[in-house]
Amino acid sequence: TVGLISGTVSLKVAKLAGTQSVNVRSDAAAMGVRGTQFTVTSPPTGDILVTCDEGEVICTDDEGRELAAIPGTVVEKRPGELFRTVPVAVSSLETFRKNWNAERIDALRANALRAIRSFAALYATLSREFNANYAELMKKQAILSKWQEEDRRGKLGSAMEIMREKKDIVRHLFALRRTLFQFERVYFRLVELKVYHDQGYGRGTIAAGETTTQFFQKLESEKKDVMKKMAVIRYVTKLYALRNDGRVPTGLSDEEQEDDGDFFGD
């Protein structure tokens, strides 16, 4: 699975065997493919464009609705709207992608202040949740330090130790990863919006008298702490997966975790 926060990802997937699959996941949709050459584009506006040169891409939104992108038909999704198909000749795909992305960026510049206000409000809420969940995980420092030392030595604890440690940490790690999925997307969209803000777009007041300039200064001052915490969460997730047959926490108890996501992939 490839996580797409913003930008463009192009993949050519050869024939896959068995249960293998390739997926691209954004904050609002998932694209599943087999034997396909395709491109997924997502500008800072949150729009999604899926174009397919060959094969087929199944696009699934966050409510489970599906739509297929095939040669001659692209799929797009705008924030708050459903997927829709648009007919486009395969020979014109590259030009269509460039024009589509340029239109989205022009729209963003025209409505930059509204976008900044929206993402700033989400950031404030998710940041509080993220930091609170992180603090809860850090209360398990004895386990985290033990895992880090075992990782340094290239060893694992006994089966009984691992079972006990996973049980103590699984719910905290699951809650944190669930928040992180949303938080990092909001954070990096704001980082992109700052580029346009620095060019003079979207300047104004956000809320309670705070200006956009003050907000981005605060965002920059928090950057080091945010990036460190994100890195720690990914490292702890890796250490957990090493003790759980390569599977990441789903929020279930250790005894129930039979269908966790595979951290290492196929």
PLM ranges: what are they?
Residues 1-75, 79-156:
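Flexible, surface-exposed loop/linker segments and immediately adjacent secondary-structure boundaries
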Residues 111-266:
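Long, low-complexity or tandemly repetitive, helically biased scaffold regions used
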